[in-house]
Amino acid sequence: GRHHCDRSPSEISNTKKKMSVIKIADNGGHAITMTSFDGYHIASFSPPEILCEIFNNIPHIKFRHDDVFVCAPLKSGTHWTWEIVSMLLNGKAEIIHKSKMTQMLEAVPTEIIDGVPSPRVLNSHLHLCRLPREALEKKCKIVLILRDPRDVAVSLYHHCKGVLKHDYDGMFENFLPLFLEGKLMYNNYLDYVVEWE
């Protein structure tokens, strides 16, 4: 069922965890490939050993007072919002020639994020309890995006079918229960929303 954080970020950060590639089968027997970190499922951005190092270092990321932090559940418009915020900070409505992935907490090593010049537009799909406390303590600007969960489910379904590393070829009616039960990447959508209330 539902998976939420039952531990504080300091408890999470003080325990080195391991990652593994898992397959979760839908009601029709079709499996989706993803990575699991202490029961928390994420997309397989990198091999598990690299993702494990990234995740173990997330609580130690140093935020800056001029950072803008875009937070959103998966498939909620993070990329578009990241582009718009980046354009606003650049003072120009021009295409950003770098990927939001280069500033995504759970996708790249801490050294890469640390090397981004200010002002940074960082982003993440992680639940609030898995984010560095410093993001809130430094009082950097946070942009929270919430999208109708019905739209998120449809978009995530097409994403899983379209991205080869997920290796998914199931039907939506079999996919939807996995979404509703929080068994997909970033676990439960409603838990994400409730944590931000």
Protein language model features and the residues they cover:
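PAPS-dependent sulfotransferase catalytic domain
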Residues: 9-197
